[in-house]
């Protein structure tokens, strides 16, 4: 372990406060540093918590609306890396100081890696067989918040082992000033990728955004495509999505057409910010949820894949509750098997690509399972007759273990 000035100061501060402060720590300085810098033994423990719905008031007009206003990595929030620290409430100021020192150390390392890096042009990464109309079975894989660490490379390697035909990165792809490292990490999956853009992808400079736009030949940040009887709709949470916007009109028309298309068995939506979430660093994007979940119900969306919170969560099938939107209607309370013809939407948060963990502070009542592990969600489509099935399996990078499994079955059109 490398001890810089910031780390040394952290140890001193922790030691002094633990000896002299009337408040207590439940974790040693070494434990804190091990959690922050990693000792190889604590990649993330299952944390299923004590309940709650994760819809705090943070934003620009809704109970849990986060807003667009600041860089997510620089937020002041006391919830940053909650699994790394365990303090009493009265130690908030010390916690902020320790956070600042440790995060400054990480940022300094990132800056050193980014000296004189010029954005490169990458081609051939986008899905080659877009609008494929065959009836063959296939699988696709999804995760967000990759970054460029060894954790991200492990996620990509494990994805590659499952031989997906389509790969869905769900936003916040690179946390550096360019996307060079991320394209390099994703190289084994070249020709299979259809991206969703997140906060860091559109807000960290035009040069990086331009790499994505040109590399994947997307003229808008929202778009749709078909593959083997699955309709994929990619939404842009970082663009204007309000009622009356171009994106809203596009989404409404796109879903209406897909719902009437007899060649489409499944509708899958990808979006960066979560519309539903257990308590974690980020709350639900409520204004977007209240506008679009009713559309998802109306037009028969089956699955919504989202990221932003660096953990894995998967809800029961849900329909929108206009009386209390933060408490959606659970249409099927089973944890793994669903026999439904568009009776509720499953929302899966997969911010597990490899950047970091945020931890989970309890579990919302509408969440069937949640996991603090790096990994990805593999989804297998079997187009049988008279039924078709969509099976989701979350694979943990640690030993390729199965941590979640669910199947949706419905009659074909």
What are the language-model segments listed below?
Residues 1-24:
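Classical Sec-dependent N-terminal signal peptides that target proteins to the secretory pathway
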Residues 27-37, 81-106:
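Alpha-helical segments embedded in low-complexity/disordered contexts
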Residues 39-82, 109-111:
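Long, acidic low-complexity intrinsically disordered regions
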Residues 105, 109-181, 278:
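N-terminal active-site segment of His-dependent metallophosphoesterases
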Residues 117-128, 139, 160, 179-263, ...:
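Extended active-site neighborhood of metal-dependent phosphoesterases/phosphodiesterases
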Residues 145, 171-172, 198-199, 272, ...:
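Active-site glycine-centered loops adjacent to acidic/histidine catalytic or metal-binding residues
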Residues 380-388:
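A short, structured loop/turn motif at beta-sheet edges
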Residues 392-403:
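Short, solvent-exposed aromatic-acidic interface loops
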